């Protein structure tokens, strides 16, 4: 079975991704696009500051085909540099500011970055990595602007922008949207060294429009602005179905902008929908809930660990009656968390889970956004416009609805493969346009996708498949368990034993938790039973909210404790 999108195909204009910024500056003008710690930046102000960055890059000889690295947390300076790089016709490579120098150097060298904008606290990693890179310019900024003494061969961002023109240079309009790269986006690296994904302007604009049109019922349009052609949304759906009109949305921005979810969902989509983003550089559940109340946010967004933390602090929340919808990505929301969110925020809350990968720019499926739509808990929704999903067997055969297999994706947002990795590109992207994701999923008869697990996470015990996500959902339903992750311990000819890492509420004692797990084991099939349980302070997650199972495997004690019997 191949599931196809119920949405009409989109007429994506042949324009650079930066046309979104032009359209937003013209349409929303002096309205606030970003708010952080009392400071605001308007849509027009973002265009003007980004234009100054583009002119500064041109003065350095940086333009089409060159790569600019952004090595800083979510902040207005990040957005300015991101859009400025695109206005210059250059390519952005986002880099996690917490990367170790060796990993940062590997990314900068692989991408061929010639300019990097770093955060003051993260600058030492850049300086340590610099000798192994092609960097010609190192820029720095911080929470309070430029540092007083940036250091030798380092330029403060404010000084770099001083005196630059505030109108777009226009060179971005010369790029080929189908060939020129907007992003060299590096994968999350949850299973090893990150790979650079080649994301064109067409991919970025397409996926941003797929998400924005899905959430508003609108269609793309091109408008003439004083800055050049701009892309906007037209003919949105009725307020009775899409209760947040264009230009009225407010959201907390915590998804890291150096990750696909943040780059597209946090930097691009809000410019189409006219959403004000309250920027948080890091996730703090109390601060998140305080700002959600203060700014009367209309939507909550995050990943499952975010919602687990918000639920644990719900007693600190104020009035959240303004919240109309909730979006989640990075991993499937456990059923227990969905039930708790509805109990807290109301049964009419629109909960929309999505599924995607860096290799598809961001999103492949989204839960229906219209109020009256059929939402199916436990699924990650339907294919977005122009997208197909199929489930394939071990030999590439197409499987029927209800059968578990590898998820394949085909659509206009599927990227061009990995940078300088032809063998890995050929293995993941086939000649018919399908991306082989490495995820295990199931399609139902109506095309709703359910993600079962990662193929790499699946355990094999005595010939049986054991899916960690299934065990994790069962563990999260136990009293007092606030976090759960299951990994495998190799045990020779038997394959792997399932091992659980748990976090618990502060008032729950270890004996109670272990007794609950023993009770769960009695209800499981023999090959599913958890052989070890380790209570830890926190489940390690990536910046995108994905559990770092390799870190947990490294924590497995050696030798293993005596395992439970089957």
Language-model segments: what does each one mean?
Residues 522-547, 565-566:
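AMP-binding/adenylate-forming catalytic domain of the ANL superfamily
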Residues 13, 32-75, 100-105:
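Conserved AMP-binding/adenylate-forming core of the ANL superfamily
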Residues 99, 106, 116-119, 411, ...:
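AMP-binding/adenylate-forming catalytic core of the ANL superfamily
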Residues 272-275, 289, 294-302, 311, ...:
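Gly/Ser/Thr-rich phosphate-binding loop
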Residues 205-253, 258-298, 313:
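Conserved AMP-binding/adenylation subdomain of ANL enzymes
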Residues 166-186, 193, 243-250:
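Conserved pre-ATP/AMP-binding loop-to-beta segment of ANL
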Residues 59-60, 87, 91-164, 506-509:
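Structural core segment of the AMP-binding/adenylate-forming
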Residues 382-386, 394-428, 448, 464-466:
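Conserved ATP/PPi-binding loop(s) of AMP-dependent carboxylate-activating enzymes
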